[in-house]
Swiss-Prot record:
GO terms for biological process: glycine decarboxylation via glycine cleavage system. InterPro entries: GCS_T, GCS_T_bac, GCST_C, GCV_T_N, GcvT/YgfZ/DmdA, GcvT/YgfZ_C, TrmE/GcvT_dom1. It is an enzyme of class 2 (transferase). GO terms for molecular function: aminomethyltransferase activity; transaminase activity. The glycine cleavage system catalyzes the degradation of glycine. The lineage of its organism: Bacteria, Bacillati, Bacillota, Clostridia, Thermoanaerobacterales. Its EC number is 2.1.2.10. This is Aminomethyltransferase. The keyword Cytoplasm does not apply. It holds the Pfam family GCV_T_C. It comes from Carboxydothermus hydrogenoformans (strain ATCC BAA-161 / DSM 6008 / Z-2901).
């Protein structure tokens, strides 16, 4: 695979017999023993993902917090040091540049963790709007990351650190040692389960990976990462979010704070909110036989009303489900629509999201 980057754990994936695929400019493991098995391990036990391909961008300076707040839709001014927030970052027209996590060290230092495939675009966007007294540093190449996810994530990670992990609350982080390695550990994830995202220097990646492997943690690939986030109805950029899809249409209005100072896209998003949404992301459950896939058309009352953004067989729920962007007339829960699969309309019903909620 030409010109693809490799994470520091590439050799470990090969040793484990992973099937490697290109993803966002990287050569990444899509599966090891199988997507279904890896998915179920995370839902019922514990699994780990190499997510070293993610982008890390540091924002520092006296005005760092105000600048971050100008870049993003959510409000970081409400955070304490050691807090993480989920947010979108928009273009002036309200379309989405990316969704990301913002880590607050202090009012003068933030870390933004962005999607791998969007890192260069995000960095260019941030630099385009950069204020004079703010420094923007791309830390992606000097940062590796493992996501440890599942009901037993804390129990397992606690074996490798003296730090009491109960002190890291949901969407909080701490700088601690894991297996003797200095790490940033946050209680975050992309699976719908409890878990941690662990950041460290690339040369120490194999040490942490193998310590976790020795504790019986199942490695999981991008395939299971996708089916897990799908069941939890977490958006994937290029599917539920894009330059053409605003956070409001994606159902992320809770991450758009209109009551803060000006931010990029505020005017356009406010206008969209005040005019009322014309379309939005909904959940679909197939009634007829067939698996809905991204791009498939959705028909209601004999006319096209939207398209599937993500669809698959949901392994834990054992159902054919989809997320779809549909016109408001077809968005009410219980509405029956047709998904066009191989030229034929297959019946589906609009259902509530998320499909899967931990503990339910």
């Amino acid at each position: 695979m030409e010109n693809l980057k490799r994470t520091p754990l590439y050799e470990e994936h090969i040793k484990l017999g992973a099937k490697m695929v290109p993803f966002g400019g990287w050569e990444m493991p899509v599966q090891y023993t199988g997507i279904l098995e890896e998915h179920m391990a995370v839902r019922t036990d514990v699994g780990m993902f190499d997510v070293s391909h993610m982008g890390e961008i540091e924002i520092t300076g006296k005005q760092a917090e105000r600048f971050v707040n100008y870049l993003i839709t959510n409000d970081v001014s409400r955070l304490n040091s050691g807090d993480v927030i989920y947010t979108t970052m928009c273009y002036p027209d309200g379309g989405t540049v990316d969704d990301l996590l913002a880590y607050k060290y202090s009012t003068e230092r933030y870390l933004l963790v962005v999607n791998a495939a969007n890192k260069d675009k995000d960095l260019a966007h941030i630099l385009q709007y950069r204020w004079d007294d703010v420094t923007v540093t791309d830390l992606s190449d000097e940062t590796a990351e493992i996501a440890l996810q599942g009901p037993r994530a804390q129990e397992i990670l606690q074996k490798l650190t003296a730090f009491d992990l109960n002190q890291i609350k949901y969407f909080g982080f701490a700088e601690i040692e894991v297996a003797g390695v200095p790490c940033l550990v946050s209680r975050t994830g992309y699976t719908g389960e409890d878990g941690f995202e662990i950041y460290f220097a690339p040369n120490l990646a194999t040490k942490i990976w193998n310590e976790l492997l020795n504790l019986g943690v199942k490695p999981a690939g991008l395939g299971a990462r996708d089916t897990l986030r799908f069941e939890a109805c977490l958006p994937l950029y290029g599917h539920e979010l894009s330059a053409e899809i605003t956070p409001l249409e994606a159902g992320l209005g809770w991450a758009v704070k209109f009551n803060k100072e000006d931010f990029i896209g505020k005017e356009a998003l406010l206008a969209q909110k005040n005019a009322g949404l014309k379309r939005k992301i909904v959940g679909l459950e197939m009634i007829g036989a067939g698996i809905p896939r991204q791009g498939y058309e959705i028909v209601f009352n004999q006319r096209g009303v939207g398209f599937v953004t993500s669809g698959t067989f949901a392994p834990f729920l054992k159902k054919n489900l989809a997320m779809a962007m549909v016109d408001l007339e077809a968005a009410e829960i219980g509405t029956e629509v047709d998904v066009i699969i191989r030229g034929k309309g297959v019946r589906a019903r609009v259902i509530s999201r998320p499909f899967y909620k931990r503990g339910k």
